[in-house]
Amino acid sequence: MLTIQFLCPLPNGLHARPAWELKEQCSQWQSEITFINHRQNAKADAKSSLALIGTGTLFNDSCSLNISGSDEEQARRVLEEYILVRFIDSDSVQPTQAELTAHPLPRSLSRLNPDLLYGNVLASGVGVGTLTLLQSDSLDSYRAIPASAQDSTRLEHSLATLAEQLNQQLRERDGESKTILSAHLSLIQDDEFAGNIRRLMTEQHQGLGAAIISNMEQVCAKLSASASDYLRERVSDIRDISEQLLHITWPELKPRNNLVLEKPTILVAEDLTPSQFLSLDLKNLAGMILEKTGRTSHTLILARASAIPVLSGLPLDAIARYAGQPAVLDAQCGVLAINPNDAVSGYYQVAQTLADKRQKQQAQAAAQLAYSRDNKRIDIVANIGTALEAPGAFANGAEGVGLFRTEMLYMDRDSAPDEQEQFEAYQQVLLAAGDKPIIFRTMDIGGDKSIPYLNIPQEENPFLGYRAVRIYPEFAGLFRTQLRAILRAASFGNAQLMIPMVHSLDQILWVKGEIQKAIVELKRDGLRHAETITLGIMVEVPSVCYIIDHFCDEVDFFSIGSNDMTQYLYAVDRNNPRVSPLYNPITPSFLRMLQQIVTTAHQRGKWVGICGELGGESRYLPLLLGLGLDELSMSSPRIPAVKSQLRQLDSEACRELARQACECRSAQEIEALLTAFTPEEDVRPLLALENIFVDQDFSNKEQAIQFLCGNLGVNGRTEHPFELEEDVWQREEIVTTGVGFGVAIPHTKSQWIRHSSISIARLAKPVDWQSEMGEVELVIMLTLGANEGMNHVKVFSQLARKLVNKNFRQSLFAAQDAQSILTLLETELTF
């Protein structure tokens, strides 16, 4: 018997999706494989999803896989790589607490006296629709169905039918929906799930309906006893597949909650299963109020992926009397506004306008090329493993793909992919990319990524073993097939080739020879292909660093694999808990090595990127920029934040930071240096076109202040528009800011404003400013930083003096557009 020991790396524990993936990995082996949770002293058949879920395994639990059988050595090698490298990817990223924390109710809403119910935010957003109550169905009618001689046959038929339905949905869905449906399919195909129903029928003589319900209750009870909220919330998945089985077996007992949404609807229910959610017309699902759903339920994951706002914490009996009435579900402030009046509806119309502006701006920002504040260009690209990931990466702002892990095509299968399959996969991502560069890393297999059909013997230390470019000469036909596929696909886009684990010039010279042979073959075969291809290497073996100058004669670029390079530089196995604390790329030796690579390559006209985890670490972005790296490749969700941060950094300041870091004596000194490093704030003018509006159709004072404060949030002048608005209203409480002549000057000094601003809205029609000075047609809002000293008084005084001048006022009211107002103010005012 062989054993793999590990700590559970899953932040949410071993729930349905990772259990399904682990079961799939284990089921391909003939050996018996037992999963053990040592904290719980719980054992499970690793080829049963349900049994795995039942172990109650939480993050960082001590676990092991015991493997016994004819193929145990191969199984251990492959499963160890999966557990240590890929298992964590089977878990889902959950929203942060900040994302689920309701904003304080803005004064521009509370002053309108809305009829509100308060709840808890589960999925952020705002939805407008009719409140519709979904009643829960009792299962008593199924439980009461007497046992029948046909029950066993009916069970098999129902299981097969449900599996067929789930498979059909899998073919039609993608993203989170597909992942959750796969987990459900795994559960109903699980021997333990069906086996327990059969045992209840044979040993306890229960009818099929009662047995399905009893099995559901037993599994749910076990999950409900878990210490993990995430595992407790998997109860909904068990209930879901059990209820689907009941409905398939007795279709005549049609559930009352078969809901069709014919207009925008806010759905109110005790809970909603994933299959119920997927059956809804999402175009008309404005939001949901779910009394008992937890923050990590699969229904919530689907809702977030579909941008459906959700609240909880509202008792159904408190909402039932409002059924059929219009409402606004505000899952930003955590409230339900019942039967909103015109003023409240107007507030949410303004909120939607601001949300649309923000979404448009974010899309534009993501599409922009990445530059530092002083216009230093750096490519921000994505790491992906399949062509399906490419569109999402580009939507996040990826300027290309810095690492396409082609080895994913070779894994978890019985034979290697043929040339056509590879060509189609590579072509797909290139077509999605347009002219964006795609760097295909040739197959990084062998060693820690064992491929059974290659029959590479097990090694003591696979990370230092027979892998990547080292295996290519033995498997030259396999490598040539991949080269042909990439060269064919390269004729459809900007393809580049990268070779992993290179340590000598001989290896790259051999590879270049194989590329030429592949080109000759493709010409002979009459297949469309690229005549040349940009070639680079992964820099992950330290020996390469000392002969970068020689490699510059043979390749076009370098990409530093920081994960493996760190291991090899320090002789540290990052998966060994006794030495993993030594694994740290932010040390003087590592940074000096990066500096040497970049300097030497740049001197010879070659570019250098980084594609390990370090590339997406925002804390270390100033160092990477300062070291002169030309490209950062990372997981695509990190790209928007990295691009945004880069725009705040001055490359010269970062270069000095990197120089100082390379002179440090320890990692601790470098971390202290980073902590003390404060990027210089981008200076923005007090007056800017982005904050000036003409002919704004506001109904009241509240909308004007809401819009102007919210717009400052959209434009990045404040990260806290609600808090800034509160400061404006506090000033309004002291004395109204209507100054006469149809003008109001709301103002504040606030800690919440990053860039002091003057915002202007000329209104389409006057509004009541609740001031003795009459209605207002022009709003000039001053929001100045808390550290501005007496500057706010100077600005206010200048404006007030100018506004007394009739000609100045008339010019403001007569200006044709926002640019004309900006030009007038810049001419007349000095700050």
UniProtKB/Swiss-Prot annotation:
Residues forming the catalytic site: 15 (pros-phosphohistidine intermediate), 298 (tele-phosphohistidine intermediate), 611 (proton donor), 747 (tele-phosphohistidine intermediate)
Pfam families noted in UniProt: PEP-utilisers_N (PF05524), PEP-utilizers (PF00391), PEP-utilizers_C (PF02896), PTS-HPr (PF00381), PTS_EIIA_2 (PF00359)
Cited SUPFAM superfamilies: Enzyme I of the PEP:sugar phosphotransferase system HPr-binding (sub)domain (SSF47831), HPr-like (SSF55594), Phoshotransferase/anion transport protein (SSF55804), Phosphoenolpyruvate/pyruvate domain (SSF51621), Phosphohistidine domain (SSF52009)
Example GO biological process: phosphoenolpyruvate-dependent sugar phosphotransferase system
Cofactor(s) listed in the protein's UniProt record: Mg(2+)
Localization in the cell: Cytoplasm
Cellular component terms (Gene Ontology): cytoplasm; membrane
Domain annotation PTS EIIA type-2: ranges: 685-828
UniProt KW keywords: Cytoplasm, Kinase, Magnesium, Metal-binding, Phosphoprotein, Phosphotransferase system, Sugar transport, Transferase, Transport
Domain HPr: 1-90
Residue(s) carrying Phosphohistidine: 15, 298, 747
Reactions this protein catalyses: L-histidyl-[protein] + phosphoenolpyruvate = N(pros)-phospho-L-histidyl-[protein] + pyruvate; D-fructose(out) + N(pros)-phospho-L-histidyl-[protein] = D-fructose 1-phosphate(in) + L-histidyl-[protein]
Binding site for Mg(2+): 540, 564
Residues where phosphoenolpyruvate binds: 405, 441, 563-564, 574
Chain residue ranges for the region called PTS EI: 119-650
Family from the record: Belongs to the PEP-utilizing enzyme family.
Free-text function comment from the UniProt entry: Multifunctional protein that includes general (non sugar-specific) and sugar-specific components of the phosphoenolpyruvate-dependent sugar phosphotransferase system (sugar PTS). This major carbohydrate active transport system catalyzes the phosphorylation of incoming sugar substrates concomitantly with their translocation across the cell membrane. The enzyme II FryABC PTS system is involved in fructose transport.
Free-text comment about domains: The PTS EIIA type-2 domain is phosphorylated by phospho-HPr on a histidyl residue. Then, it transfers the phosphoryl group to the PTS EIIB type-2 domain. In contrast to classical PTS systems, the fructose-like PTS has no requirement for HPr and Enzyme I; FryA combines a IIA domain with an Enzyme I and a HPr domains.
Protein name, as recorded: Multiphosphoryl transfer protein
Species of the source: Shigella flexneri
Record lineage: Bacteria, Pseudomonadati, Pseudomonadota, Gammaproteobacteria, Enterobacterales
